[in-house]
Amino acid sequence: MEFLGQLVAWFADPEQWTGHNSIPIHLAGHLALTGFALVGGLVIALPIGLVIGHTGRGAFLAIALANVGRAIPSIAILGIVFPISLRLDLGFGFLPTLIALIALSIPPIVTNTYAALREVDRDLVEAGRGMGMGELQLLTRVELPVGAGLLLAGVRTAAVQVVATASLGAVISADCLGYFVIHGIATHDLPEIFAGALMISGLSLLTELLFALLQRRVISPGLQTTTPLARAEAGIPGF
């Protein structure tokens, strides 16, 4: 109970909410890192996943590289990127952390996008070709709607990983919630360490919840039970 009181007192301290090293500043930095990293990962990984998923070409190499990337520990990625960024005069903090987080987000998006498209029934795709659909139409009107659930699951995984791992940026002076853990360790402040870990965990869980809700809204029950091609054959408007 005494520790819980210290934790509450830490959060209630006005100093934690104002100034350069306040919670709002580091939360904003954390959100900026994760947001830019996820967008960067999508820009790179989504086209790769769509191409190899739709055509099947280069899939073995791309998926093998993605799996290798997933096997590398997050701190190791940061350890690889940081000295390179110093050599290139990219500095400390935001940019090297962002590059590492983008690299971390790519593998789950690539693998899930590929799997989402390859899991679409081939008979459904061939039926679309028989109806005169081009490759782009097949991708956007058949494969993507049917595989959207698995694709979004990959984005969801990447988002949660990025949010949780962004805290490591504090090691190289990036503004993020990990600052409170690092600073707490340096000053032997157990409530601060626990507060930082609590905020990081809470933000990760919130990200998981938001993407779960997004999946439910985007993948409607009707879309899950009725394929786009079936709706077209039935003459349902909007196809």
Residue ranges with predicted function:
Residues 43-48, 62, 96-99, 103-125, ...:
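Membrane-embedded alpha-helices of multi-pass transport/permease systems
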Residues 1-38, 85:
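Periplasmic/extracellular loop-to-transmembrane helix junction in inner-membrane transport proteins
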Residues 117-147, 175:
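Short helix-to-coil transition segments within interhelical loops
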Residues 177-214:
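Hydrophobic alpha-helical transmembrane segments of polytopic membrane proteins
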Residues 22-33, 80-108, 148, 192, ...:
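Loop-to-helix entry region at the N-terminal start of transmembrane alpha-helices
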Residues 48-81, 101, 108-115:
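Cytoplasmic-entry segments and transmembrane alpha-helices of multi-pass inner-membrane transporters
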